[in-house]
């Protein structure tokens, strides 16, 4: 079964995004968060979501508790939060909370 090709390092994902001129999709989650679990086990396993994320973005998934520097840098106040960045690091969209697959895809489409 296909899955999202998550990276676990923000800095190397930025380098990769700049080399490939692709946007970054950053998901900040917390272990034990029910909405985070639903997003990861339901939305991120949907074939349409997997295809869209892997083809259009450099996906990064980070535990907010272990990456407080990133949480503070981007002023994230809850989990899960999904952020989309240009290759140069400029934030273009954020959508906090859980989204079922169809709604998640709609959010991704808004990024252009």
Label every PLM stretch briefly.
Residues 20-33:
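Short active-site neighborhood of thiol/selenol oxidoreductases, capturing the structured segment around
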Residues 6-23:
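A short beta-strand-turn-helix
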Residues 10, 35-52:
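Typically the conserved alpha-helix immediately C-terminal to a functionally engaged Cys/Sec
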Residues 44, 77-112:
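Non-catalytic, surface beta->alpha helical segment in thiol-disulfide oxidoreductase systems
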Residues 64-70:
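Structural microenvironment flanking redox-active thiols in thiol-disulfide oxidoreductases
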Residues 72-74:
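Short amphipathic alpha-helix with an adjacent loop that forms part of the alpha/beta core around
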């Amino acid at each position: 079964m296909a899955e999202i090709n998550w990276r676990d390092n923000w800095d190397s994902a930025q380098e990769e995004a700049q080399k490939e001129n692709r946007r970054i999709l950053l998901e900040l989650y917390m272990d034990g968060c029910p909405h985070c679990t639903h997003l990861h086990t339901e939305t991120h396993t949907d074939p349409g979501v997997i295809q869209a994320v892997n083809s259009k973005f450099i996906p990064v998934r980070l535990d907010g508790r272990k990456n407080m520097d990133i949480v503070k840098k981007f002023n994230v106040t809850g989990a899960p939060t999904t952020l989309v960045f240009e290759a140069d690091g400029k934030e273009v969209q954020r959508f906090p909370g859980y989204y079922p697959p169809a709604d998640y895809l709609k959010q991704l489409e808004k990024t252009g």
